[in-house]
Structure formats: C-alpha cells, structure tokens
C-alpha cells in the first residue's frame, strides 16, 4: 500500500508578485527549488499564513537568486505581494520507503533568502519566526 507523506516545504516565504494575467502556477526562485527538492511542474500547495487561504498549483522556475515567489493566474486573487506563505509538496511512498524518509524544510527570511535548508519540524506550541 502506498501512502501520501509530506515531502518538502519552503516555510514563511514572502509573496513578491501576483500576476493575474499569467496562465497559472507559482514562480519560485530556482535556489529555493533546489534547496527544497521541488521540481519544475511539480504540484505545490500554497498555504497563505496572512489570509488563511489554501490552494494547489504547480511550480515553475523563477530567476535564480531573485527571491521571487510569484503567484500566477486566478490564484493571484487569493495571494498578494507581502503575504507570508508556506509552499509544500507531498509524495506517495510505500511502507519501506517511508520508514527512513525525512522531509526537507527550507526556512527563509523576509526577502526569501535561505536561512536554513535542513530544518527539523517543531511540534506543539514551540514557535519559529523568520528573521
């Protein structure tokens, strides 16, 4: 049996652009894609911390080193520049794969520069705040 597991996330990224007229997707700085292991065209969940909205789209490469997080298409109605978001992916794993699997968590600052790229999830009331 295969199960769905959390694979990777970019935590508390800042939306830099929202382009209503683009076809869709989320443009993500290529440095962040590399650090998180998110591939171009991979399904990505966008959880907006600022507005409480959630949606699913797909990733496309943004300019390397730019810090870009651009929400494209109709999703631009739900995400605006300056909003904080979590970008997350999931993977289907069988039990043997899942036993040793650890997700990738990338922490970024307010300019979407990598602060930590092998972060450990903090459970419960402990709180992590980006610089």
Curated annotation (Swiss-Prot):
Enzyme's top EC category: lyase
Cofactor(s) named in the record: pyruvate
PTM-bearing positions, type Pyruvic acid (Ser): 25
SUPFAM superfamilies per UniProt: ADC-like (SSF50692)
GO term, biological process aspect, one: alanine biosynthetic process
Active site positions, chain numbering: 25, 58
Pfam families: Asp_decarbox (PF02261)
GO (cellular component) term, any one: cytosol
Catalytically driven reaction(s): L-aspartate + H(+) = beta-alanine + CO2
Pathway membership: Cofactor biosynthesis; (R)-pantothenate biosynthesis; beta-alanine from L-aspartate: step 1/1
Superkingdom of source: Bacteria
Modifications after synthesis and translation: Is synthesized initially as an inactive proenzyme, which is activated by self-cleavage at a specific serine bond to produce a beta-subunit with a hydroxyl group at its C-terminus and an alpha-subunit with a pyruvoyl group at its N-terminus.
Enzyme Commission numbers on file: 4.1.1.11
Single GO MF descriptor: aspartate 1-decarboxylase activity
UniProt-listed NCBIfam families: panD
UniProt xrefs under PANTHER family: ASPARTATE 1-DECARBOXYLASE (PTHR21012:SF0)
Function: Catalyzes the pyruvoyl-dependent decarboxylation of aspartate to produce beta-alanine.
The protein's assembly and partners: Heterooctamer of four alpha and four beta subunits.
Protein name, UniProt field: Aspartate 1-decarboxylase
The species this protein was found in: Anaeromyxobacter sp. (strain Fw109-5)
Native organism taxonomy: Bacteria, Pseudomonadati, Myxococcota, Myxococcia, Myxococcales
């Amino acid at each position: 049996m295969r199960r769905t597991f959390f694979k990777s996330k970019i935590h508390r990224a800042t939306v830099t652009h929202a382009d209503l007229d683009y076809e869709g997707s989320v443009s993500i700085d290529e440095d962040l894609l590399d650090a998180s292991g998110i591939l171009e065209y991979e399904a990505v969940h966008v959880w907006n911390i600022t507005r409480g909205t959630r949606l699913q789209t797909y990733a496309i490469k943004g300019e390397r080193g730019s810090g870009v997080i651009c929400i494209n298409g109709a999703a631009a109605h739900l995400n605006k520049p300056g909003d904080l978001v979590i970008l997350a992916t999931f993977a289907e794993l069988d039990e043997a794969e899942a036993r040793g699997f650890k997700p990738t968590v990338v922490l970024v600052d307010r300019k979407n520069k990598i602060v930590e790229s092998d972060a450990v999830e903090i459970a419960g009331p402990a709180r992590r705040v980006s610089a």
